[in-house]
């Protein structure tokens, strides 16, 4: 695996695209599982407890690594390991999220806002100390609308954002040996589109008669497709359904809203200081110490990630200088 110049994220994205080709894996592509890795690494955030989220790459350690909801994600992590080893200057947390947005773009989806600055927990002890137990926070496909709102509402997402994010089911498939469910949602599960919403609205879905958990099925273009109870809840709920209909009718609208919602998702838990790096606010508060801001704010140089100039870089989690420039003066470790 090739190494790239430190901070050259565009070159790194090209390397990520290369490792997406996995002939021996699902449908020949690692793309969908890379998106799932970014999603699950971020989707355990809590606004109430203010923990979880993409910072730290906590899934490298228990309890996240053994959370049943994360079953199968070791494939995504292993696909990225050679790239991580060749480019140790990037944190796991940044690489996982960058891989997710790169995969979406490479599979025909929208460009997702992304910026570096996430840090890695150095040990299981550090992960537990700063993150706590964030298990049982991801969606359960067997449940309904109330559960979906509870899970996504904990992260601060609206009904519209919930439906937009559900469009990630355009990608990949379920596995009986992981979630218990089985099959893809769409005919081409390695191409990002609004096909999921179009199929969801078609009156073709019937309960599958099998030994696994309850799910729906339909045969489309000779392919057995499936929908989960959480998917069907989107057309049964009077607030969710209008957004399903809008996204089925307008792929450009879906792409725009998905990009905004996914960009928000991968920033959850990334509490940045004015250098652009995630900070250990909890640790600093507990120890009564000031936050570590050893790198000076960027001046008038151009950020190689966003193209913004120096202190003009704006983020979902707050403003500050370019995180890449700050990276030159600070070790990306917690």
From Swiss-Prot:
What protein family is recorded? Belongs to the peroxidase family. Cytochrome c peroxidase subfamily.
**What is the protein's known function?**
Destroys radicals which are normally produced within the cells and which are toxic to biological systems.
Which sites bind heme b?
169
Q: List the disulfide bonds.
A: none
**Which organism encodes this protein?**
Cryptococcus neoformans var. neoformans serotype D (strain JEC21 / ATCC MYA-565) (Filobasidiella neoformans)
Q: Which InterPro entries match?
A: Ccp1-like, Haem_peroxidase, Haem_peroxidase_sf, Peroxidase_I, Peroxidases_AS
Q: Which UniProt keywords apply?
A: Heme, Iron, Metal-binding, Oxidoreductase, Peroxidase
Q: What is its EC number?
A: 1.11.1.-
What's the protein called, per UniProt? Answer: Putative heme-binding peroxidase
Q: Which domain of life is it from?
A: Eukaryota
Q: How is the cofactor bound?
A: Binds 1 heme b (iron(II)-protoporphyrin IX) group per subunit.
Q: Which Gene3D superfamilies match?
A: 1.10.520.10, Peroxidase, domain 2
Q: Where is the active site?
A: 40, 185
Record-marked site positions (Transition state stabilizer): 36
Q: Does the keyword Methyltransferase apply?
A: no
A single GO molecular function term of this UniProt record: metal ion binding
Keyword Metal-binding on entry? yes
Q: Which Pfam families match?
A: peroxidase (PF00141)
An individual GO BP term: cellular response to oxidative stress
| Cofactor(s) needed for function | heme b
Any transmembrane segments, and where? none
């Amino acid at each position: 695996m090739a190494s790239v110049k430190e901070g050259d994220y565009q070159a790194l994205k090209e390397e990520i695209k290369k490792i997406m080709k996995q002939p021996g894996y699902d449908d020949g592509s690692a793309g969908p599982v890379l998106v799932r890795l970014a999603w699950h690494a971020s989707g355990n955030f809590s606004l109430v407890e203010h923990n979880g989220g993409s910072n730290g790459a906590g899934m490298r350690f228990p309890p996240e690594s053994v959370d049943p909801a994360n079953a199968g994600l070791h494939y995504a992590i292993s696909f990225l390991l050679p790239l991580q080893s060749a480019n140790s200057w990037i944190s796991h947390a940044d690489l996982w999220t960058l891989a997710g947005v790169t995969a979406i773009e490479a599979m025909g989806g929208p460009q997702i806002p992304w910026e570096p600055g996430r840090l890695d927990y150095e040990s299981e002890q550090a992960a537990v100390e700063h993150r706590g137990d964030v298990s049982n926070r991801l969606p359960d496909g067997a449940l309904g609308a109330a559960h979906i709102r509870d899970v996504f509402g904990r992260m601060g997402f609206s009904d519209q954002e919930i439906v937009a994010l559900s469009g990630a089911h355009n990608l990949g498939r379920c596995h009986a040996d992981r979630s218990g469910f089985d099959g893809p949602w769409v005919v081409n599960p390695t191409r990002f589109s609004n096909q999921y919403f179009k199929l969801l609205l078609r009156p073709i879905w019937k309960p599958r008669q099998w030994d696994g958990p309850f799910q729906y099925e339909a045969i489309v273009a000779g392919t057995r497709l499936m929908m989960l109870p959480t998917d069907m809840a989107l057309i049964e709920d009077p607030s969710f359904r209008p957004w399903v209909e809008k996204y089925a009718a307008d792929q450009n609208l879906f792409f725009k809203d998905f990009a905004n919602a996914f960009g928000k998702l991968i920033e959850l838990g990334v509490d940045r200081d004015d250098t652009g790096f995630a900070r250990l606010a909890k640790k600093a508060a507990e120890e009564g110490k000031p936050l570590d801001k050893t790198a000076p704010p960027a001046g008038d140089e151009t950020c190689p990630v966003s193209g913004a100039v120096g202190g003009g870089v704006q983020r979902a989690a707050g403003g500050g200088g370019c995180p890449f420039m700050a990276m030159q003066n600070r070790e990306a470790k917690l």
